[in-house]
């Protein structure tokens, strides 16, 4: 309480309603062009949040844990939390996961913007608290910081807070989310030569995409390439196919051979190369990495938003009303069960989860 009272006094900006409206319009126009400047979003939230914050305050007053939070006004700042100690906690605690998230994405808990334009101490604290708890939301819902993951978390926050700025973020996010994304996923550490010109970018793809570059770059031996003239005798191709697998480790015995139209039941790919009017056999070598290709905007609209809405509705208490600081040394799964928090489904983890 004492810490926030000082923070409130040092950050309060006393301006009239007309000036606030002017700031709101200017920030809204600039947010789309510079979304990384989070203070713009914070200022717009400050000015537009009075009715929503009042409702949050009334909810917290009528909730035992919420009243405790309002009375003590805990903060995720260095003066109140020993962040280095959180890294020493067991790996499945909320505090450890929180620090791991911050370090993974190079974030700092104390960097969240303080509310500037509320004259009421409690209202100012509620909005400041909402911003500080935002990263806790990433952790407990298992969301990374991509545009689509941020948008999904904003939908959860809209359900829980009714803040207008969260609705704006949800509406704008699909236009800012990439249509298509290529992402290298490494099983181990990032190879030192990843950015070098001679790095072998072929991969084993979990979604069975064909690496188009590897079809063309014969000189780099990225794939085995096989050709035969087209024949109508199906038995010929059956024998050819068997011959290849009998000599799978002896490429000199099969190089210069191709299989046309034979049903492929292996983990390799047979595709039809339209320009050359021929079938190509691609030998997929096991790699320590894969190129993951997906459509973030489509995933956001069809999967992340529906999940986020249901996750927001099912949670029994908004995060800002929970005394998070008392849970930092507790098991994160226990925290989720206590408040019925549904983390990101496994099938969306590679696209939107914390990796």
Swiss-Prot record:
Pathway: Cofactor biosynthesis; ubiquinone biosynthesis. One of its GO terms (cellular component) is extrinsic component of mitochondrial inner membrane. It is found in: Mitochondrion inner membrane. InterPro entries: Coq4 (IPR007715), Coq4_euk (IPR027540). Zn(2+) binds at residues 134-135, 138, 150. Transmembrane segments: none annotated. It is a peripheral membrane protein. Pfam families: Coq4. Lyase that catalyzes the C1-decarboxylation of 4-hydroxy-3-methoxy-5-(all-trans-polyprenyl)benzoic acid into 2-methoxy-6-(all-trans-polyprenyl)phenol during ubiquinone biosynthesis. Belongs to the COQ4 family. This is Ubiquinone biosynthesis protein COQ4 homolog, mitochondrial.
């Amino acid at each position: 309480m004492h810490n926030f009272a000082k923070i409130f006094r040092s950050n309060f900006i006393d301006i009239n309603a007309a000036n606030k409206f002017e700031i709101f319009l200017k920030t809204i126009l600039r947010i789309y062009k510079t979304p990384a400047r989070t203070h713009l979003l914070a200022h717009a939230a400050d000015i537009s949040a009075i009715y929503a914050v009042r409702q949050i305050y009334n909810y917290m007053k009528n909730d035992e844990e919420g009243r405790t939070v309002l009375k003590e006004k805990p903060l995720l700042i260095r003066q109140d939390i020993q962040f280095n100690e959180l890294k020493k906690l067991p790996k499945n605690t909320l505090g450890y996961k929180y620090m791991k998230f911050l370090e993974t994405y190079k974030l700092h808990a104390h960097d969240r913007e303080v509310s500037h334009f509320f004259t009421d101490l409690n209202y100012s604290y509620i909005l400041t608290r909402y911003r500080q708890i935002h990263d806790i939301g990433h952790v407990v819902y298992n969301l990374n910081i991509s545009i689509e993951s941020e948008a999904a978390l904003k939908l959860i926050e809209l359900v829980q807070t009714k803040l207008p700025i969260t609705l704006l973020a949800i509406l704008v996010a699909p236009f800012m989310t990439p249509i298509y994304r290529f992402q290298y996923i490494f099983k181990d550490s990032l190879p030192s030569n990843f950015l070098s010109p001679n790095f072998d970018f072929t991969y084993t793809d979990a979604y069975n995409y064909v690496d188009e570059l590897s079809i063309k770059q014969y000189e780099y031996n990225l794939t085995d390439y096989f050709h035969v003239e087209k024949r109508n005798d199906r038995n010929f191709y059956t024998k050819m196919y068997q011959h290849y697998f009998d000599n799978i480790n002896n490429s000199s015995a099969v190089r210069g051979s191709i299989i046309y139209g034979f049903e492929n039941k292996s983990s390799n790919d047979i595709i039809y190369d339209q320009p050359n009017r021929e079938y190509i056999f691609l030998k997929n070598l096991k790699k320590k990495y894969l190129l993951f290709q997906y459509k973030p905007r489509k995933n956001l609209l069809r999967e992340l938003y529906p999940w986020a809405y249901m996750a927001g509705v099912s949670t029994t208490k908004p995060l800002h009303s929970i005394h998070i600081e008392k849970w930092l040394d507790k098991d994160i799964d226990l925290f989720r069960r206590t408040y019925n928090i549904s983390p990101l489904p496994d099938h969306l983890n590679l696209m939107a989860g914390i990796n």
